[in-house]
């Protein structure tokens, strides 16, 4: 079982060269890894299909729109397992601050009024996916607790650009990892901006929190 780059590219009309380069390297490294079983390939396919769909929706929504710049960020940074996620979660309990929730990263559009019944459906669908993920990977909660309503880190959103450490957490991808260490992340921040501009349509916080 192999992942098709062409099928993924057909899901989105936004094809900046940096994105195509990253996606090609990612897919080639996944397909070359003989240690990934069919369940692993299915997990990658599900992740990539979702991210391409979200990428296209964001691109179409933001196209030709003059949206205000997002609020100034607070950036939480640190080494893995150093407590950054705890600090991130504490900051997100302050009503003046804002971080994307997990469901908003996986299902941000079409845009919804906050608190609508359609929002509840998206939250339910996201939690159902996460429950299944915990069945397949019982240690998932011990590694990184994920819930639909949990504030989530920027790397989860970066997946729409095909430049994210999330993919190297899923499998051993040495060539792709080397690429991430050396690549320019300008286009990643450009997509971040679009995403936060859309999130702020439901209310502008004092600051956005990044990790």
PLM regions with names:
Residues 13-51:
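Charged, amphipathic alpha-helical linker segments immediately N-terminal to NTP-binding catalytic cores
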Residues 44-64:
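N-terminal pre-Walker A segment at the start of P-loop NTPase domains
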Residues 65-71:
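Phosphate-binding P-loop
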Residues 76-92:
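Glycine-rich phosphate-binding P-loop
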Residues 94-103:
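Post-Walker A helix-loop "phosphate-sensing" segment adjacent to the P-loop in P-loop NTPases
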